């Protein structure tokens, strides 16, 4: 039975039983602490947690969810039952049926005949486990279903009691196993041998609430839930393995075709030895996982989801090369896995080119890294072995990472294959030093000096009290003063200084928002604050110019925010949140924030996305953003726990470290909810119009949108309007007629360029006729050698040489031409006909000789070579040398 048929039978079974079929969610959800969806129930969490009412008429649902688990990537292929990507088929009940219903549904599908729509498994080969104290489930299996008591085994909390690992719903579970036969292991049921007895379905009975605790079995059960729910998960791949009669999940109809292609590309044979078998399985598994991640919008990167994808793709490439592959392989692997997966995921067809583009680009970059890095690793490994040691030092691992881009995981794998360990502590220490240097360099740029220990006293004992959320003016005591990076007790007019205050209303740069501008006042003393930076997370450093007067440590001053600056900065920051929300509406949840910068009237927003945005997409994003502005929504600030913020659906930067208490900015209810410590407007209409300037690439898989807000947006739009009107006036048309007018002019220009090109081509053909007629003969080979000063570019020169070659195609002939462009450089081309090449007269050899006389370098293939020279005056001498070589 093919995998797609197993999927259909599962869905049909539960739809007939009144469940609503729910499409698989993306592998990428908004949860900042969840790399990928890793269980079938994840998209249903809000219903299980009681945060939302389930929208299913009968209170039941079924889905086949895409899942990725990457905790044990190194184990892929070693165990033959686990994949990094898998399809979890599940049925869910929200306060409807419970244990008996879940058990009955599962048994009917598994043991029902194929003719009746079931999977046709032999009931005599099915075993079940239940939680140690779950007499109810054991009795249902035995009395209602008829499973003999000897095939019902009881296990403790670690195996048969489910929770999410945090306080919330939990409950006992019952697992269904299939006995694959004595050839796979010992008798005795799942307790005795979980290789012979393969788990295929887990039924979770959510009936209790879990309290605090750690691990799978060290937590308190607080009490019963108001409603009893069902969450089940059947592994599609494992059932396919059984129904298709293959030894493991890598040999099913979905993955075996990739192994077949790997055999063709490498010359190795699957099944001959354990090491190669693991590599074949890695290729098959990772090709599918990588393809599905790219499908859902992940791009290779150096952290988070992008790092996982990069690691998977690089393991494929390296495994293929260890098996004997030469050159590029990913395109064929990806095409094969897309063919097998498209019947279940038709959206692959529309994304095929994008998936290939991402994979091929990553492979191209890594192949360069692999060659140079592998050579260094092998040298270091040999040195270690020859010294009698077994540990590759941290410095070598760091160099592989820092210079050659080798992820430490790859170095660890290669070391293990070579029988070596890696000094991971030494590696981590060097990485920490590098990060510290980078931070110090960045801080030095911000503060004008690199020694940050000077702030230690204030960081430890006097963290700044920030008052700027509530007020723009604060009276405060001066705790410290710095001038030229040194502590001082007083400052005077004209100095550039840093001021440490007890409390401040000025915002310190963070979260992409620039530091406030403002003043520090005391009597006649005026300090102009040019920037505010943070040291650590709690100390505000005010960079200021003493405009008049002076200050001493201990003085009480008034710190004042420039209200115009703050207002415009708030407009930009809240505008960034709206653009982020609009982006996700248009592009989907994979368009996650990669960085931002907000300053008065201007914002830029970086996000993970592989392709440039179309004008239509940009227009839609701008329209959604401005509709949100026009809606005059309240902008609410909520201070709450991190757990509660996540429960609200607040977006966060993946991998960012947040405290237990966080600040949530909510605009328009569910439209935009983000964790943010910045300053914001109180109503969305205060942002004013948002004008998107455009979008661009700022790195592999990262795009950037730039926009103006508020008054700057008005100014930009007015400037654009004036520009359009000026252009329309100069063309003597109305502004709305400009597109047609420009299109007409563009077409005229294209026509003129074509006419010029045609004329140029005719001139070249005429010139070719004359050059062929003037050919001389050297050692039985015709030679056309000419300086053509009226041919300025390499394209025309190559065309002329190709034309001459074609006219002399039936005889041995060599063509050598040199031109001269407007800058004085001399492009040159050397060509040879097939007959000449066959006789040993090669264009690339003559190009090198000629280049020596005209101060140039040339290279290429035997039939056509080219180069660029600085001085064509030596052409005649060069041709004489070519003649001599031809006559030799």
From Swiss-Prot:
Cofactors that this protein relies on: Zn(2+)
GO BP: alanyl-tRNA aminoacylation
Residues noted as binding Zn(2+) in the record, renumbered to the chain: 573, 577, 676, 680
One Pfam family linked to the record: tRNA-synt_2c
Catalytic reaction equation(s): tRNA(Ala) + L-alanine + ATP = L-alanyl-tRNA(Ala) + AMP + diphosphate
Cofactor note: Binds 1 zinc ion per subunit.
GO MF annotation list: alanine-tRNA ligase activity; aminoacyl-tRNA deacylase activity; ATP binding; tRNA binding; zinc ion binding
Alphabetical list of PANTHER family matching this protein: ALANINE--TRNA LIGASE, CYTOPLASMIC, ALANYL-TRNA SYNTHETASE
Domain-level remarks: Consists of three domains; the N-terminal catalytic domain, the editing domain and the C-terminal C-Ala domain. The editing domain removes incorrectly charged amino acids, while the C-Ala domain, along with tRNA(Ala), serves as a bridge to cooperatively bring together the editing and aminoacylation centers thus stimulating deacylation of misacylated tRNAs.
Name of the protein in its database record: Alanine--tRNA ligase
Organism whose genome encodes this protein: Corynebacterium diphtheriae (strain ATCC 700971 / NCTC 13129 / Biotype gravis)
Gene from which the chain derives: alaS
């Amino acid at each position: 039975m093919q995998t797609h048929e197993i999927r259909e039978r599962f869905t049909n079974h539960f739809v007939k039983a009144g469940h609503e079929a729910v499409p698989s969610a993306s592998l990428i959800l908004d949860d900042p602490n969840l790399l990928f969806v890793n269980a079938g129930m994840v998209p249903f969490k809000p219903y299980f947690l009681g945060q939302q009412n389930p929208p299913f008429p009968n209170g039941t649902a079924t889905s086949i969810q895409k899942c990725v688990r990457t905790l044990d990537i190194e184990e892929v292929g070693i165990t033959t039952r686990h994949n990094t990507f898998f399809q979890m088929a599940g049925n869910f009940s929200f306060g409807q049926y419970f244990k008996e219903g879940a058990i009955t549904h599962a048994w009917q599908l598994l043991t029902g005949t194929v003719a009746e729509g079931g999977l046709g498994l032999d009931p005599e080969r099915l075993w079940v486990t239940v939680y140690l104290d779950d007499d109810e489930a054991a009795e249902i299996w035995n009395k209602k279903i008829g499973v003999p008591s000897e095939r019902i085994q009881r296990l403790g909390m670690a195996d048969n009691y489910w929770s999410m690992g945090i306080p919330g719903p939990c409950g006992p579970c019952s697992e269904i196993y299939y006995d694959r036969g004595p050839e796979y292991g010992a008798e005795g049921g799942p307790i005795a041998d979980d290789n012979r007895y393969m788990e295929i379905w887990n039924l979770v009975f959510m009936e209790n609430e879990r309290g605090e605790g750690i691990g799978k079995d060290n937590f308190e059960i607080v009490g019963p839930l108001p409603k009893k729910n069902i969450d089940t998960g059947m592994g599609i791949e494992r059932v396919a393995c059984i129904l298709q009669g293959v030894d493991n999940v890598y040999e099913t109809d979905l993955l075996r075709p990739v192994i077949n292609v790997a055999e063709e590309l490498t010359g190795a044979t699957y099944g001959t030895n354990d090491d190669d078998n693991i590599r074949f399985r890695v290729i098959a598994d990772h090709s599918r996982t990588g393809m599905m991640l790219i499908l859902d919008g992940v791009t290779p990167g150096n952290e988070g989801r992008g790092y996982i994808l990069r690691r998977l793709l690089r393991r494929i490439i390296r495994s293929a090369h260890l098996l004997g592959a030469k050159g590029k392989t990913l395109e064929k692997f990806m095409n094969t896995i897309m063919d097998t997966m498209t019947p279940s995921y038709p959206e692959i067809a529309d994304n095929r080119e994008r998936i290939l583009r991402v994979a091929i680009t990553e492979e191209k970059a890594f192949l360069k890294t692999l060659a140079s890095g592998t050579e260094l690793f092998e040298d270091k490994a040999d040195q270690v072995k020859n010294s009698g040691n077994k540990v590759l030092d941290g410095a070598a691992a760091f160099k592989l990472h820092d210079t050659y881009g080798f992820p430490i995981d790859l170095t660890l794998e290669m070391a293990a294959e070579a029988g070596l360990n890696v000094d991971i502590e030494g590696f981590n220490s060097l990485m920490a030093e590098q990060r510290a240097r980078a931070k110090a360099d960045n801080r030095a740029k911000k503060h004008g000096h690199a020694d940050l220990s000077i702030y230690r006293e204030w960081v430890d004992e006097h963290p700044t009290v920030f008052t700027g959320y509530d007020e723009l003016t604060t009276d405060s005591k001066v705790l410290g003063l710095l001038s030229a990076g040194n502590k001082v007790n007083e400052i005077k007019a004209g100095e550039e200084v840093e001021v440490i205050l007890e409390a401040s209303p000025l915002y310190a740069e963070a979260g992409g928002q620039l530091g406030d501008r403002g003043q520090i006042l005391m009597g006649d003393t005026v300090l102009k604050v040019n920037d505010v930076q943070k040291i650590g997370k709690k100390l505000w450093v005010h960079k200021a110019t003493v405009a008049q007067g002076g200050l001493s440590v201990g003085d009480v001053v008034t710190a004042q925010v420039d209200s115009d600056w703050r207002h415009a900065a708030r407009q930009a920051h809240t505008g960034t949140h709206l653009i982020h929300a609009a982006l996700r509406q248009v592009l989907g949840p994979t368009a996650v924030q990669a960085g931002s910068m907000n300053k008065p009237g201007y914002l830029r927003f970086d996000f993970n996305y592989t392709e440039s945005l179309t004008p239509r997409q940009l227009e839609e994003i701008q329209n959604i953003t401005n509709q949100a502005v026009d809606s005059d929504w309240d902008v609410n600030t909520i201070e709450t726990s991190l757990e509660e913020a996540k429960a609200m659906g607040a977006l966060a930067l993946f991998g960012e470290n947040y405290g237990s208490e966080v600040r949530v900015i909510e605009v328009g209810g569910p439209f935009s909810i983000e964790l943010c410590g910045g300053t914001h407007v109180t109503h969305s209409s205060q942002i004013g119009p948002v004008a998107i300037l455009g979008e661009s690439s700022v790195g592999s898989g990262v795009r950037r949108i730039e926009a103006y807000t508020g008054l700057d947006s008005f100014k930009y739009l007015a400037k654009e309007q004036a520009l359009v009107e000026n252009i329309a006036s100069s063309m003597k048309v109305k502004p709305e007629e400009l597109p047609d007018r420009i299109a007409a002019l563009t077409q005229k220009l294209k026509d003129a360029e074509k006419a010029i090109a045609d004329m140029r081509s005719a001139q070249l053909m005429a010139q070719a006729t004359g050059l062929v007629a003037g050919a001389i003969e050297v050692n039985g080979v015709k030679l056309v050698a000419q300086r053509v000063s009226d041919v300025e570019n390499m394209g025309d020169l190559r065309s002329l040489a190709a034309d001459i070659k074609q006219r002399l195609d039936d005889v041995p002939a060599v063509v050598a031409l040199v031109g001269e462009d407007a800058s004085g450089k001399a492009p040159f081309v050397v060509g040879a006909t097939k007959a000449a090449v066959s006789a040993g007269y090669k264009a690339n050899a003559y190009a090198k000789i000629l280049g020596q006389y005209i101060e140039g370098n040339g290279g290429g293939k035997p039939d056509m070579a080219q180069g660029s020279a600085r001085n064509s005056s030596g052409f005649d001498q060069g041709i004489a040398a070519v003649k001599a070589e031809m006559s030799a």
